Amino acid sequence: MRLYVSGPVSGKTHHEAVGYFESAAKLLVSYGYAVSVPTRFVEPTASHATAMRKCIAELLRCDGLAMLPGWRRSAGACLEVAVATACGMDAKAVEAWLERDAS
């Protein structure tokens, strides 16, 4: 199962955002998930619109969405959760994906 990792990026340095997302990605991978992480494919200089187009396209290639803490404070993450939900994908906190019966 491939999970898209969603969370706040704005207000963080690129280095902080990468660390935040990669920590969650490493944990999810250790539980057997494949992951898609926006900081891996969106250039730090991309406009918000360009970033969201790339993120939504990648999200739709995934099977579920793993939400990082603070996602509700991010307009982009809220949009990603709405798209995932509208498309019938499970959207849960990262920790919820780690429970035995999560997948």
Regions found by a protein language model. Give the residues of each.
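Conserved catalytic or regulatory cores that recognize and/or transform ribose-phosphate-containing ligands
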Residues: 1-103
